[in-house]
Regions:
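Conserved, helical-rich catalytic subdomain that frames metal- and/or nucleotide-binding sites
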Residues: 29-78, 147
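Conserved catalytic micro-motifs used in adenylation/nucleotidyl-transfer and phosphoryl/amide-
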Residues: 1-19, 26
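Short, surface-exposed beta-strand-loop junctions and turns on beta-sheet-rich folds
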Residues: 14-16, 24-25, 33, 90
């Protein structure tokens, strides 16, 4: 049988990350003016992080009559952890901090351990500034017992 496919639709600056075998990867690209400037080489990462325009979104639901989402497909693997998070979290918590927290989740992941990791991510975001709403969701890829 074909391996399962994870479909990801994205607009705006909320992000999806994947933690696979200890490596964190940002799967989405922010639809923001600052991200466009960064990709064009007009500003540095440090300038982007402190830009007063970092919340200027170029694509979002509700900003126009229609919006074209970015659609991606991924092949999830056992023990992958996917994180969906608002900019309130990703602007306050570094990728290194995210990776450290996600790597520390014991395997096999459970609802309790994923909930604890979400709480820890929110605590770190609040400790680091927490000036915006903070939303985070973790999804772990578990073995499919029906295929065992």
């Amino acid at each position: 049988t074909d391996p399962p496919t994870l479909w990801l639709g994205h607009v705006g600056d909320s992000r999806c990350y994947r933690q696979r075998r200890g490596k964190l990867e940002q799967l989405t690209i922010d639809h923001s003016l600052v991200e466009e400037q960064l990709r064009a080489g007009q500003i540095t990462l440090d300038q982007a992080a402190h830009s007063p325009m970092r919340n200027l979104i170029t694509r979002a639901i509700g900003s126009q009559a229609t919006v074209q989402p970015e659609i991606q497909s991924h092949r999830p693997q056992l023990n992958d952890v996917y994180m969906l998070a608002s900019d309130g979290l990703t602007h306050e918590v570094t990728d290194e901090e995210i990776a450290e927290i996600l790597t520390a989740i014991p395997k096999p992941q459970t609802v309790a351990t994923l909930t604890k990791a979400c709480e820890e991510l929110i605590t770190v975001a609040n400790r680091n500034g927490g000036n915006d709403n903070i939303t985070v969701l973790l999804v772990a890829v578990a073995p499919d017992a029906s295929r065992a």
